[in-house]
Amino acid sequence: MSSQPDASQLSTLNSRILKQYWGYDRFRGIQEDIIDSISKNKDTLGLMPTGGGKSITFQVPALAKEGMCLVITPLIALMKDQVQNLKKRGIKALAIYSGMSRQDIIITLENCIFGNYKFLYISPERLDTEIFRTKLRKMHISMITVDESHCISQWGYDFRPAYLKIAEIRELLPDVPVLALTATATPEVVKDIQARLHFRHKNVFRMSFERNNLAYIVRKTENKTAELLHILRSMPGSAIVYVRNRRRTKEITELLNNEYITADFYHAGLDDATKDIRQHRWQSGESRVMVATNAFGMGIDKPDVRIVIHMDLPDSIEAYFQEAGRAGRDGQKAYAVILYAKSDKTTLHKRIPDTFPEKEYIRDVYEHLQYYYQMAMGDGLDCVREFNIEDFCRKFKYFPVPVDSALRILTQAGYLEYTAEQDSTSRILFTIRRDELYRLREMGEDMDRLIQAVLRSYTGVFTDYTYINEDSLAIRTGLTRRQIYEQLVHLAKLRIVSYIPRKKTPYIIYTRERIEAQRIHISPEVYEHRKARYETRINAMLDYVTNDTVCRSRMLLDYFGERNEHNCGQCDTCISLRSKSKASEQPDRETLCAKVCEILSCESLTPAGLLKQLPMDKELLTEILHRLSDEGKIIAVDGILQIKK
């Protein structure tokens, strides 16, 4: 094994890797500071807003180091996307996430030990399994990356108990440095992340959350639909409209299309092909507006979004800041608009019992879950079951939203693991040798085009299951997505490939055997404390939208612990305060009338000549002159103004 480069050599190597694999000549913002820190094996926390280039900060130093980077992230769709992007660059990467079979997990872990891979992406829930920890001891891990690291903090808006297991992984790898990354963290969360990840020394790098090109606007209106149409007609460019539920996505989309504003809708309940097609139409500009729930946006690469509009209030500043931040990533002028009605305050407070249903309700959901799966007392440990929430609610007369919340709380309490709306990306593995491909040419031109497109687009298809995108293959071959699917199924039947199609599958995984519902213990940390913090975040959101005296950009920055002494000058509050200031600077009308009379008593003037001597605009002067004329105090003779004798 070659010796590890020193810090200065690593810095040079990092720059060379950036150029070789990504084509960039230099790092952006604080990327280089973070990379230098982790390259020196220092535990590091990087605070970077959405679109700040987080992935570069761990992918570059990991390639410079010997061994493999362990990447812990809860975002399964993003995990798969990054693995695929790394493979396209010729970098070996694998992923383990909820829903994979035990055999697939074992094969993946064995490849990490013997296959010279550089990255293993893993969901936090998988860290606690015996098989992972056994195999981990045999791996050469160079660094640990914790993405969405705010999830480890109970002060955070998205606390996940599985993240607490990372500290145990650190004990197994005591000499391995950790890089924690997040786009949203308050000062309390920043401290908590470092403590819970057992940082040897406090070490934080912050990229400013200020967005000089993004204007934050709150429009108070009781007719949100009319205001939405007005905004989209007034402001050109690509847009995202966020709404709270799936039904509204369709309703708003139909409204916009009827008004000749091209729009599509997107939510987690759509099938994968529909999602991909609509996302492609929007990204290519074929559809101007994407109307979506918060399921849309993570990992979307579209820098020219000009406006993000929230028709409904998010339930935290953190969520709003992340969604609003998808506008204007190209650095050009953009807008983030919230439409706020008085009824929104009541609506937001009603989310509290939906998000934290009564404990007895949660126990009832747990018990009915056992009836649903016909699970005996004491059974269930490590059982994986697909879960159809609509079917479950229909059978047991529940509403989906509080059931979803109950399952999340049971996950937090450690009784099960619930992964909602999980997308399983298609995978393919050739089961014949490369030198046998020649015989497939006899199967027709379409088949030959498909195979050639697969070989050109993806590496490693003869040695490992590789994620593929049927829509991309359709574009490259000129075939339809349906034809691609049918051809791959045909190849699988002939045992030429092993093909695992995409599937949208929510899962419930039992992390403990079934117990009596009344024995379910939900601790204050999981329930009461989190509920109180949720209420605090809701109140912060309401303070933001009802505020009319403080610059909105400063208000957001202050929430995340960043001090800023100047106003943005472009939010609705700044514009309103500036208008009021200008109005207050103008003398009152009685004073202006007296001033006009004083000037005209000394000399007769035209209106234009008078305007040069007075601090007012033309419209106001016209109003003053009409008033003085009506009162009989001045007259105009051949266009010359004078005092009436």
Regions found by a protein language model. Give the residues of each.
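Helicase motor core with emphasis on the C-terminal RecA-like subdomain
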Residues: 3-21, 25-29, 33-55, 61-65, ...
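C-terminal accessory region of SF2 helicases/translocases
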Residues: 287, 305, 313-322, 328-638
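Intrinsically disordered, low-complexity N-terminal extensions of nucleic-acid-metabolism proteins
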Residues: 1-3, 9, 120, 253, ...
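Short, Lys/Arg-enriched, disordered terminal segments
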Residues: 1-15, 583-587, 591, 645
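Gly/serine-rich nucleotide phosphate-binding loop at the start of the catalytic core
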Residues: 70-71
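A broadly structural signal marking compact, well-ordered functional cores
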Residues: 95, 227, 231, 245, ...
